């Protein structure tokens, strides 16, 4: 996926101080959603409510050399980390729970989903699909060529989290 310039990280992190970073981030999210239909309506757009300094500081933190030069699925792992923290901080109300990654990994390793359809009737944040992708990658198989994923979720917030999780991990 090649993003328009105004949606690219380098553009946002180097945005002049006199420009509204909150509005620029909202525009970037809209451009990404237009480019990647799977993310339509899933990305957050409330950036204008945050202090510009906070937004710029966060962009700079993720712009450090260590992150830019990291190998593997670093941003996917970062996303999972914050998703887990979000779930543990009380976002599991209403009977919705994040299945611990260790349990999801165990399930995937037991069923060994190497072809066909992977269906999760309560997919939550999409962890089963992500770990299926990890499993297939470890086997030297391209996930999108080996399996088709289907998920169902009653909570709209979880649906958005799942779509973002899949996108961050390169799964469609």
Please report, for each region that a protein language model flagged, where it lies by residue.
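Conserved S-adenosyl-L-methionine
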Residues: 93-172
């Amino acid at each position: 996926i090649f993003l328009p310039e105004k949606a690219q990280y380098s553009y946002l992190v180097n945005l002049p101080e006199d420009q509204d970073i909150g509005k620029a981030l909202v525009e970037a999210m809209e451009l990404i959603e237009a480019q990647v239909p799977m993310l339509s309506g899933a990305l957050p757009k409330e950036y204008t409510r945050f202090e510009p300094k906070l937004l710029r500081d966060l962009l700079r933190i993720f712009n450090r050399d260590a992150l830019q030069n990291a190998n593997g699925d670093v941003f996917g792992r970062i996303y999972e980390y914050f998703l887990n923290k979000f779930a543990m901080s009380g976002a599991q109300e209403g009977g919705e729970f994040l299945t611990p990654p260790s349990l999801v990994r165990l399930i995937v390793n037991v069923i060994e989903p190497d072809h066909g359809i992977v269906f999760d009737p309560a997919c939550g944040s999409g962890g089963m699909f992500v770990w299926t992708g990890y499993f297939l990658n470890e086997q030297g198989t391209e996930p999108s060529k080996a399996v088709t994923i289907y998920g169902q979720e009653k909570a709209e917030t979880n649906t958005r989290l799942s779509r973002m999780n899949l996108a961050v991990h390169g799964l469609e």
